């Protein structure tokens, strides 16, 4: 059903190229396949159950245009959950900042004082593609490398709405939790 919906939404619009993989090989693998098709100056990822505010991309690009040394721009992050009582939203507890150098952004990302939802220059993704050593958690490594290699990291006012749900691979208890350790080990 999702494939059919995507085809109907993007039909006739040359800005979109749909890619369908034969099997699920994890988020990092899929994103690396998509990056090979990316032609723009900036890259952002949006997971299938998440959404962006109407102005999110425009807001991020305006920060890049105003600050030529900026290599990564963080969205405001709002987590949400659909409950029987309605939609519950909570802003991610991150201090807003004007600009950080890459090393400082990297340090703040280690304990997620800085979240990992951002737009980056395509050149960062080309230099540091997604670590596909694990099916989960390895995108954390890529985020940290992008921050570390950035001349400047800034925030924008665009909002990324992140769907929080207990059945998510990274939130439920399973042996997949050990992928976190494997992902950390691959950072060496």
Language-model-derived ranges and their functions:
Residues 1-185:
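Nucleotide-sugar donor-binding/catalytic module of glycosyltransferases
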């Amino acid at each position: 059903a999702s494939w059919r919906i995507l085809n109907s939404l993007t039909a006739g619009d040359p800005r979109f190229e749909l890619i369908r993989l034969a099997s699920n090989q994890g988020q990092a693998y899929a994103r690396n396949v998509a990056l090979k098709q990316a032609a723009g100056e900036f890259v952002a990822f949006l997971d299938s159950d998440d959404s962006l505010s109407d102005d999110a991309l425009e807001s991020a690009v305006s920060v890049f245009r105003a600050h030529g040394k900026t290599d990564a721009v963080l969205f405001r992050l709002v987590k949400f959950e659909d409950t029987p009582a309605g939609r519950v939203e909570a802003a991610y507890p991150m201090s807003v900042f004007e600009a950080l150098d890459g090393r400082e952004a990297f340090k703040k990302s280690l304990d997620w004082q800085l979240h990992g939802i951002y737009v980056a220059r395509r050149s960062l993704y080309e230099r540091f593609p997604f670590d596909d050593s694990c099916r989960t958690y390895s995108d954390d490594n890529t985020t940290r490398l992008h921050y570390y290699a950035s001349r400047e990291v800034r925030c924008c006012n665009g909002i990324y709405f992140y769907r929080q749900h207990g059945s998510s691979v990274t939130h439920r208890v399973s042996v997949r939790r050990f992928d976190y350790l494997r992902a950390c080990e691959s950072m060496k």
